[in-house]
Amino acid sequence: MNRRKFISGVTSAFLLSISSQLMASDTSETEHKSHDMSKMPENWTKDEQIAMLIYPGFTALDLIGPQYMFAGLMGAKVHIVSETLKPITSDTNITIIPTTTYDKVPDNLSVLFIPGGGESVIKALSNEKLMNFVRKKGSKAKFITSTCTGSLILAGAGLLNGYKATSHWVARDALSAGGAIPIDERVVIDRNRITGAGVTAGIDLGLTVVSLLRDNLYAQTLQLLAEYAPKPPFNAGTPITAPKEAVEIITSMFGNYTKNAQNTVKKALI
């Protein structure tokens, strides 16, 4: 066994252990003998089916933030979906193993979730099998959701036409290529479309979706469990608050991204 496979195996075991503690998939079958559950309302256990798409080069934190919240839905089943069951490597070289494939995802989805990425999103928009999966499941899902540039994939699938939506700030304007109305907000809800802004907004999106599937108290309880009370060391999380030099660096790095994304979204719609 080589070093990479060993690390992958240890990581998978660790994540499996964490997910079981956080009431992840098939939580209705999990006994929490070490926890006193008597204070929890009886109606807090349901049976949602949640599909979270992954593809080569997706942004890991786009997935992990919402997944933590979705995994806390007692009784829900969270599917990590890709074309095959082969491990998928993220933008930061974290390897995630899918739990199911496109053809085995239930039709009665409570949530379809799409993470974003950089150039990987451009490639995903040109992937016919991936886009057909998003179109098919998105046409029936109760909630259609995304974080960061994942909304570009929704736009390319024709699922945001006429809807308000957001994305990472460097790509937000590209949403208009799919008929969406770009909105500068951390989380945007328009009917059953729920989109999050860049990367870390996935945590906020996850809590928002949880509150809609269950109730505000459930979401607040998960927020407390996660101790999600961010106080970043810098106030540079948006182009408005960040130093001019930082904005110029990022804008220069992604100067052609919006145009490329717009063109690719348009092609995906044809």
Q: What does each model-identified segment do?
A:
Residues 144-145, 166, 183, 194:
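Structural detector of well-ordered beta-strand residues that form the stable sheet scaffold
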Residues 117, 188-192, 203:
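Flexible glycine/proline-enriched surface loops and loop-helix/loop-strand junctions
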Residues 198-202:
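Short acidic alpha-helix initiation/capping motifs at coil-to-helix transition points
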Residues 2-144, 152-155, 172-173, 182, ...:
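Extended, subdomain-level signal for the structured scaffold at the beginning of enzyme domains
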Residues 184-197, 227-228, 239:
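Conserved Rossmann-fold dehydrogenase catalytic segment
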Residues 125-128, 166, 197:
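Residues at secondary-structure transition points
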Residues 160-187:
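A conserved active-site-flanking secondary-structure segment within enzyme catalytic domains
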